[in-house]
């Protein structure tokens, strides 16, 4: 997964999840129910309106057989990217 991580770091984990669900032909609502999560919560993450949290990332990673911590690592890289953009936009 490290090679993939280097390619996609800076992308919101929800966008990666959306692509993965489509690739596997998994319905977003059914997936939310399978991991015992509210569909609205999952949708907000997929739309990048909400950050990934540890509990949810572990559920998703287990269900989709991702390496543990993969989605949270994506979230951290995304947060770094956003913070860097904000810092560049505001002068010291």
Regions found by a protein language model. Give the residues of each.
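The alpha-helix within a helix-turn-helix
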Residues: 21, 32, 61
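Short alpha-helical DNA-recognition segment
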Residues: 26-44
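Short, charged recognition helix plus adjacent turn
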Residues: 72-92
């Amino acid at each position: 997964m490290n090679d993939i991580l280097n390619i996609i770091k800076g992308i919101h984990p929800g966008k990666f999840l959306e692509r993965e669900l489509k690739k596997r032909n998994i319905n977003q609502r059914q997936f939310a129910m399978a991991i015992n999560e509210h569909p609205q919560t999952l949708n907000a993450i997929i739309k990048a309106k909400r950050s990934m949290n540890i509990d949810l990332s572990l559920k998703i990673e287990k269900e989709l057989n991702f390496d543990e911590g993969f989605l949270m690592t994506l979230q951290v890289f995304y947060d770094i990217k956003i913070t860097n953009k904000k810092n560049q936009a505001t002068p010291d």
